[in-house]
Regions:
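Active-site metal-binding motif and surrounding structural segment of the metallo-beta-lactamase
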Residues: 44-89, 93-94
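Active-site metal-binding loops of divalent metal-dependent hydrolases
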Residues: 8-10, 39-42, 67, 92-93, ...
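Active-site-proximal loop/helix segment associated with metal-binding centers of metalloenzymes
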Residues: 99-105, 109, 115, 127-160
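Beta-strand-turn-beta hairpins that frame and shape the catalytic cleft
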Residues: 1, 30-34, 129-137
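Hydrophobic/aromatic beta-strand patches that form the interior of the parallel beta-sheet core
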Residues: 4, 63, 88, 123, ...
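Hydrophobic alpha-helical segments and helix pairs
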Residues: 72, 77-78, 84-126
């Protein structure tokens, strides 16, 4: 298995040719499968992919870890550059996610255009699901561990 970071928050001194954006996108390649885990906040991962020998058009499936813009809004670009792969994410009735601190409020949720214009390729799951042979999405993450302190500033529209 090979995991390639297509985009994240940090610039590599050894790779000034790679663009940086807030967010994350990983390409995971196995002997039989090409997958994306998250797609960053925009199309930057698509710009970086050819520089890292990754063909977005050949990706078999994609997974969105959660509905914050810096992990999922690049999916709009993904469906433009890849005509076949499904994009999997956890079902949620919540549509709007916000960050609020020090008098500022910012929408940090999924772009509603993605939910409307995904050509039927957005697949919602609500339980542990095998999405490819031996590849599972786990939707129920336990609360056994303390959440990051920054989460105190995150909420959904229905919470406030």
């Amino acid at each position: 298995m090979k995991i390639t970071t297509l985009v994240d928050n940090n610039r590599l001194d050894s790779r000034p040719d790679l663009a940086v954006e807030r967010g994350l996108s990983l390409h995971i390649k196995t002997e039989s499968l090409s997958m994306l885990f998250d797609m960053g906040g925009g199309g930057t991962f698509c710009q970086n992919a050819p520089l890292l020998d990754v063909e977005i058009k050949d990706v078999d499936l994609a997974v969105i870890s959660h509905r914050h813009h810096d992990h999922c809004n690049g999916a709009i670009d993904f469906v433009r550059h890849n005509s076949n792969a499904n994009v999997f994410l956890k079902h949620s009735d919540e549509r709007s996610y916000y960050f609020r601190a020090y008098g500022f409020k910012n929408n940090v949720g999924i772009n509603p255009d993605l939910l409307k214009n995904s050509s039927g390729r957005l697949k919602f799951v609500n339980k542990t699901t095998e999405i490819a042979r031996n590849v599972f999405i786990i939707t129920d993450i336990c609360d056994k561990y303390e959440k990051p302190k920054g989460n105190q500033y995150l909420y959904t529209k229905s919470q406030h």
